Amino acid sequence: MEEEHINQRPSATVEEYSYSEADFVFSGLSWKERRQYAEDTSFLSPFDKALQSKWEQKMNEGLFRYPLRNLQTKILPGSLSYVAQLNIQRSINRRKPEDIWSIQQKFNPNQFNYNKIKPEEIVFQMIRSETEHCVDSDKVHGSSVNGMGTSDCKSGSTHQRCCILECKGGCTLVVINVSPLEFGHVLFMPDPSLCLPQILTEDLMLFGLESVLLSAHPGFRVGFNSLGGFASVNHLHLHGFYLDHDLFIESSSSKPLCPEMNFHLITHFPAPSFLFYTDGRNLKSTAQNICKVTDFLVAKNIAHNLFITRGSNPDTGNGSEGRNGIRVNIWARKPSFGAKEVSAFNVALCELAGHLPVKNQEDFNSITEDSVIDIIHNCLLADDEFTQLSLDLVEYLRK
C-alpha cells in the first residue's frame, strides 16, 4: 500500500515518501500487457498510486494554471508512430520562460525560481531509506521535515530570502508542474535553497533512474532540458510524467559505441541520440557515465536534452516488446537562445523522443510525420559536427 511509504509528521506541512531498493520494479510490463489491464489500475506500484492520487488532488484544488483532462491524441501515420497531443492551454497559460543566453549560465535569484513556488504545489519529498524492505515496514523511515519557513539561499555568495521547504540531505522534492504536459506532470528537484543552475548532477540523475524503477507503468517518463535546450527555468530540476503510449525510441536499434559502458548510438531516428542502457542493477555507475557526457556537453557549450524511459535491451534487436530495462537518450542539439516559437511545437525532451504537444488546432489537424521531421532537423547539429562529437565522447569516456 502506498500509505505505508508516506509519513506526515504533526509539525510538518509536507509529507515524506520513503523508499528503498526493495521497492524497485525490475520486471516491467510490456505494452501488450499494459493494454490488457485497460482501465484496471491494480498493476500500479505504491509510488504510482501515491503520486497520481496527490497530483489529482491538487488538480481538483485548482492549483494548476489550467485543468488537464483527456488530451486529444493521435498517432501519426508512418513508421515512427509519433504521438501528437493537442495542448492549447499550455501554450497560452504557461509562465514566460526565463531569458537564457548560455548553457553555463549562473543561477539568478532575481529571476523566477523554485524558491518562489507556493507551498501547496509541493506533492511530497522523497527520501531513500537504507532499510531493505520499506514496503513491509510498519514505520516509514527517513529524515524529518523542517516545514515551511524563511531561509537563505545556500549558493555561494548569492543571498536570497526564500519561503521554501528545506530538504534534509539526500531528499528530492516533488512539485507539480502548474502548466502540465500530461497526466501526473511533476518536477523533481534537490533542495531548492541550494540554488543550483540547470546543469545535471549525478545525484539527481540517479534519482531520475530510481523514479522510473519505482513506477510499474511503462509510460512513466523522466527528462531533462539543458539551458539552450528549452529549459524555461535556470534552477535544477527534472520533469516526470505519464504518457500512456508506446514510443518508437523504446525499442529502436542502435550501434554500440562503448559496449563496456552500455553506451550506444541511435541513428535510425530523425534525431540521432546517444543511448545508455541499464537493467537497473548498476544505477550509480550509469548515472556517473551519463553525467560525464552531459558535463562534456556543458564544457563545450552544447545544448542537450535527455529522456529516461523503460525500454528494451538494445542488444536484443529492433522492435523487442520487452521493457525490463531503462533507456536514457541524450540529444546534442543547436541552442534555442532567443528562438521565436513559430513552429507547431517546441523541440525539447518530449518532442525529440516522439511525444508532440501541439500548440493549436490548425497545426494538430495538419501535422504529418514528414513535417515533424523537418522541424526537428532544423534543431540538430550538422552531420559532420555530430560525427566528430561522437568520436570525441568515445575517446573521453575511455580515458
Swiss-Prot record:
Disulfide bonds: none annotated. InterPro entries: GDPGP. It comes from the Eukaryota. The active site is at 237 (tele-gmp-histidine intermediate). GO terms for cellular component: cytoplasm. GO terms for molecular function: GDP-D-glucose phosphorylase activity; guanyl-nucleotide exchange factor activity; hydrolase activity; nucleotide binding. The keyword Disulfide bond does not apply. Its EC number is 2.7.7.78. GO terms for biological process: glucose metabolic process. It is an enzyme of class 2 (transferase). Signal peptide: none annotated. Keywords: Cytoplasm, Guanine-nucleotide releasing factor, Hydrolase, Nucleotide-binding, Nucleotidyltransferase, Transferase. It is found in: Cytoplasm. It catalyses: GDP-alpha-D-glucose + phosphate = alpha-D-glucose 1-phosphate + GDP + H(+). Specific and highly efficient GDP-D-glucose phosphorylase regulating the levels of GDP-D-glucose in cells. Belongs to the GDPGP1 family. This is GDP-D-glucose phosphorylase 1. The gene is gdpgp1.
